[in-house]
């Protein structure tokens, strides 16, 4: 669970919540084969009921700083819809302990779990990342998550990948919901040809320049090196175009590039 045990003292990570949203039985696992009950057992927690299960969450979140984890990540777009509005606690309870709950029970279970985690994250000022766009494509557009974001105004949401192909929808939400930040991760790799236009739109729409940042989403060092080189070039080309057209000055472009590439993420995750 502690990334520094594997990679060294300069690293921090986020805690992926998928297995918790799918943790109705010992047999249930997320798409990476992670088991919630096995993970909780490693932390010394053995819930016997669904209510016990929910009561483990504050303890899990309170342990994150000691494990050098700086946020939560919801990548459930690979497992299910990103709509989390079925907050039926009784239906969620009925999923507990079943090897194969009904689709309605599974959704209610996950909805209650994710909503609870979002609330707890907001109370602790823990950022909450969400993968949007690709995955199970029919349920991964940004507006599917609007209810979750509205119910948790204290939670800082980082919505990833520019929600490609729904980038304009995502930017519209970020204009309305001031607890949304934008992660450009992977979006320029998916479509380098259209990325400059989407970046320009983000610059136009976002309420302030602190709300956009960058990640890599790569497996290997060589891939990360190539990806960061590509996005630096695309950002420079886009900002140079803004300067030529008189949208802002060269020093403004220089400041914005630093914020996108480093400063905004450091501030968002409260990094030193």
What does each model-identified segment do?
Residues 2-6, 21-24, 79-83, 136-137, ...:
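Short catalytic/ligand-binding loop motif for oxyanion handling, primarily in non-cytosolic enzymes
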Residues 11-44, 83-104, 234-238:
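Active-site gating loops and adjacent loop-to-helix segments of metal-dependent hydrolytic enzymes
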Residues 16-22, 75-79, 133-135, 162-165, ...:
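Active-site beta-loop-alpha junctions enriched in small/polar residues
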Residues 14-18, 184-188, 210-216, 249-255:
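A generic structural motif
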Residues 208-210, 225-272:
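Mid-to-C-terminal alpha-helical segments outside catalytic/metal-binding sites
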Residues 1-20, 70-77:
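Divalent metal-dependent hydrolysis catalytic cores, especially in the metallo-beta-lactamase
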Residues 49-73, 81-180, 194-213, 231, ...:
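Histidine/acidic residue-rich metal-binding segments in metalloenzymes
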């Amino acid at each position: 669970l502690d990334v520094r045990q594997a990679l060294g003292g300069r690293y921090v990570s986020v805690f992926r919540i998928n297995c918790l949203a799918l943790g109705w039985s010992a047999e249930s696992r997320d798409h990476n084969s992670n088991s919630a009950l096995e993970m909780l057992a490693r932390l010394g927690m053995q819930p016997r009921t669904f209510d016990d299960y929910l009561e483990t969450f504050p303890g899990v979140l309170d342990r994150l700083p000691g494990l050098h984890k700086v946020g939560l990540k919801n990548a459930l777009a690979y497992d299910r819809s990103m709509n989390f509005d079925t907050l039926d606690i009784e239906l969620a309870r009925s999923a507990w302990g079943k090897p194969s709950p009904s689709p309605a029970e599974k959704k209610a279970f996950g909805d209650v779990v994710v909503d609870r985690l979002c609330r707890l994250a907001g109370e602790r000022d823990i950022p909450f990342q969400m993968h949007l766009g690709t995955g199970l494509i029919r349920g991964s557009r940004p507006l599917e998550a609007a209810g979750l974001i509205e119910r948790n105004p204290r939670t800082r949401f980082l919505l990833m990948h520019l929600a490609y192909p729904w980038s304009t929808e995502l930017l519209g939400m970020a204009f309305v919901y001031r607890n949304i930040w934008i992660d450009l991760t992977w979006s320029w790799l998916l479509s380098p040809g259209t990325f400059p236009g989407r970046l320009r739109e983000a610059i136009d729409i976002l309420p302030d320049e602190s709300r956009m940042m960058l990640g890599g989403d790569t497996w290997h060092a060589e891939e990360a090196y190539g990806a960061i080189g590509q996005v630096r070039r695309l950002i420079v080309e886009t900002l140079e175009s803004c300067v030529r057209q008189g949208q802002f000055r060269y020093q403004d472009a220089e400041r914005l590039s630093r914020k996108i590439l480093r400063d905004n993420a450091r501030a968002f995750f409260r990094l030193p």
